[in-house]
């Protein structure tokens, strides 16, 4: 059944938003996996775990925001299966941050692709929504992860376990 509030909302935009919801849920699921990996008794980097748990929550909120906007515009939410994270073991903090950086770049590219669909279908509401709610935040996340990777390397990772401990205690502890 078609929505009575739908206006200037192309079916391609609606489908692309549903795919983006799935991407955000996948990112949330991946960050949740990372969080509980670093919370294990044999890893015990609790501030790193907390950081990844916060990232998971943020990605889930992004998915919910997209779904809310989909409903507001008169679109229909069609959820897909969420793929499991690419791995279960995340190695050291440097490896996990590098994986997180790649994930954020993938999410950012998906958002840019969604923006292009909105632009191609002349949907200023979608473009404004993405520009206001997502794009700047993605750039900030990518920069933050890049900074963390630089500092982890500076501390001697992956060879230096003490550097990983200090990063967890001081860098991640301060951002809590």
Swiss-Prot record:
Task performed by this protein: Stores iron in a soluble, non-toxic, readily available form. Important for iron homeostasis. Has ferroxidase activity. Iron is taken up in the ferrous form and deposited as ferric hydroxides after oxidation.
Keyword Oxidoreductase attributed: yes
One GO biological process term: iron ion transport
Binding positions (Fe cation 1): 24, 59, 62
Similarity field: Belongs to the ferritin family.
Enzyme nomenclature, EC number: 1.16.3.1
Highest taxon in the source lineage: Eukaryota
Entries under InterPro entries matching the protein: Ferritin, Ferritin-like, Ferritin-like_diiron, Ferritin-like_SF, Ferritin_CS, Ferritin_DPS_dom
Residue ranges of every copy of the Ferritin-like diiron domain listed in the record: 7-156
Molecular function terms, GO-annotated: ferric iron binding; ferrous iron binding; ferroxidase activity
Oligomeric and partner information: Oligomer of 24 subunits. The functional molecule is roughly spherical and contains a central cavity into which the polymeric mineral iron core is deposited.
Organism of origin: Aquarana catesbeiana
Impact reported for residue 135 to P: Reduces initial rate of ferroxidation and accelerates iron release
Enzyme class: oxidoreductase
GO cellular component: cytoplasm
Binding positions for Fe cation 2 per the UniProt entry: 59, 104, 138
Name assigned to this protein: Ferritin, higher subunit
Catalytic reaction equation(s): 4 Fe(2+) + O2 + 4 H(+) = 4 Fe(3+) + 2 H2O
Misc remark: There are three types of ferritin subunits in amphibia: L, M and H chains. M and H chains are fast mineralizing; the L chain is very slow mineralizing.
Bridged cysteine pairs (disulfide): none
Annotated residues for binding of Fe cation: 58
Keywords from the UniProt entry: Iron, Iron storage, Metal-binding, Oxidoreductase
């Amino acid at each position: 059944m078609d929505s009575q509030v739908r206006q200037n909302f192309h079916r391609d935009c609606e489908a692309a938003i549903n795919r983006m919801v799935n991407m955000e849920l996948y990112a949330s699921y991946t960050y949740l996996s990372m969080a509980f990996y670093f919370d294990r008794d044999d890893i015990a980097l609790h501030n790193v775990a907390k950081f990844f748990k916060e990232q998971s929550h943020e990605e889930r909120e992004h998915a919910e925001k997209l779904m809310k906007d989909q409903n507001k515009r008169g679109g229909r939410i069609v959820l897909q299966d969420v793929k499991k994270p690419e791995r279960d073991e995340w190695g050291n903090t440097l490896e996990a941050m590098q994986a997180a950086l790649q994930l954020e770049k993938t999410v950012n590219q998906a958002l840019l692709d969604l923006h292009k669909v909105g632009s191609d279908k002349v949907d200023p509401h979608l473009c404004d929504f993405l520009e206001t709610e997502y794009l700047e935040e993605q750039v900030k996340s990518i920069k933050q992860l890049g900074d963390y990777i630089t500092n982890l390397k500076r501390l001697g990772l992956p060879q230096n376990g003490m550097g990983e401990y200090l990063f967890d205690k001081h860098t991640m502890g301060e951002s809590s």
